[in-house]
Amino acid sequence: MNCLKICGFFFALIAALATAEAGTQVIHAGGHTLIQTDRSQYIRKN
């Protein structure tokens, strides 16, 4: 179960890096919400 969350997190992170030019993105991974701004900063929320 923990491996599934980690794999999902890395998958979402890779997907975010692949589409970084899209601007602000909201990523749901591992039970957390990662918000990527145009400055490539991540805000982590539970």
UniProtKB/Swiss-Prot annotation:
Keywords associated with the record: Immunity, Innate immunity, Secreted, Signal
Domain of life: Eukaryota
GO biological process terms, semicolon-separated: antifungal humoral response; defense response; innate immune response; response to bacterium
Signal peptide residue numbers: 1-22
Entry's Gene Ontology cellular component terms: extracellular region; extracellular space
Key word Signal present: yes
Conditions for induction: By bacterial and fungal infection (at protein level). Detected within 24 hours of bacterial infection (at protein level). Induced by Gram-positive bacteria M.luteus (at protein level).
Effect of inactivating the gene: Adult males infected with spores from F.oxysporum or F.verticillioides display reduced survival.
Tissue: Hemolymph (at protein level).
Compartments where located: Secreted
Comment field (misc): 'Daisho' is the Japanese term for a matched pair of samurai swords, one short and one long, and refers to the role of the two Daisho peptides (Dso1 and Dso2) in defense against fungal infection.
Stated role: Peptide which plays a role in the humoral immune response to a subset of filamentous fungi, including F.oxysporum and F.verticillioides.
UniProt-recorded name of the protein: Daisho2
Species lineage: Eukaryota, Metazoa, Ecdysozoa, Arthropoda, Hexapoda
